[in-house]
């Protein structure tokens, strides 16, 4: 069966620079890597093609030979154990591929996966801090084989294919290319008698309960990292981390903007005109707020230090109260008559002295129409 063109495999032009080839390789490798396509033979074969194409096209000597002779330049190949002769491409794989999948030179042991837990908090809990118990599903070390994957009384043995190196060498013409051992998958060892509980994986599915301390001042989008509380690694490798993602629920009174809190405070029009004192809510309880005479809707009153303390310590935000002047409703006849008398005392709906904003607005409207008729 004819082999595919290396340039077509990576999806690059024949005059592509090495930087473009590396970028294309990364993209393709992530898509078809065996760790992401377990049990998919077609993806595994595709990945081998991608890897082979990358190895040739990023080596100047190999690429020149391929451009001139095609695949014929690398015929007459064979496979052997990992040795010292020939070109060693492990460093290239480490640079380009290791950062993505954690691959390494020689034996490969995978660190445990990180876990994420979404936690909803009330505004009060986020502001003051709280300790919560959470239960999470995870992978933990098998208590029968203690993570080895082997049946008690036995142990893993050196891989007969790679002799414990985790890699084998493929010879193609006068070149030698190293790749992950297909027998042990890079581990360097194989398990002949697997543990009956974990079936050779060294890990089992469990749930665990953790106590999580949430610091005061957190907000939506913040993450708390619990080191080593993720899934345990394969065959004794380091465990991953647990990330607690914070989501603060909407509050019926307060809105938060960074470390400041905002709330709307309704007052009647008499207090707005004459001034007075009202009680406003804070997260620490009720406090008195003095409202000066002639206060308008939208006026902001700042109460310093009544907001949220910074999660990093030090500064504390403020509470900003926005006044909303309410129009009275369901008036009786006596109240309506009093309002009519009040309006008359103003000299009409747009009394110059008592309603400066109304007068300014009406003057502007008059000027607008005067300009239109000129």
From Swiss-Prot:
PANTHER family: CHAPERONE PROTEIN DNAJ (PTHR43096:SF48), DNAJ HOMOLOG 1, MITOCHONDRIAL-RELATED (PTHR43096). Zn(2+) 2 binds at residues 159, 162, 181, 184. One of its GO terms (molecular function) is zinc ion binding. This is Chaperone protein DnaJ. Participates actively in the response to hyperosmotic and heat shock by preventing the aggregation of stress-denatured proteins and by disaggregating proteins, also in an autonomous, DnaK-independent fashion. Unfolded proteins bind initially to DnaJ; upon interaction with the DnaJ-bound protein, DnaK hydrolyzes its bound ATP, resulting in the formation of a stable complex. GrpE releases ADP from DnaK; ATP binding to DnaK triggers the release of the substrate protein, thus completing the reaction cycle. The keyword Metal-binding applies. InterPro entries: DnaJ, DnaJ_C, DnaJ_domain, DnaJ_domain_CS, HSP40/DnaJ_pept-bd, HSP_DnaJ_Cys-rich_dom, HSP_DnaJ_Cys-rich_dom_sf, J_dom_sf. The keyword Zinc applies.
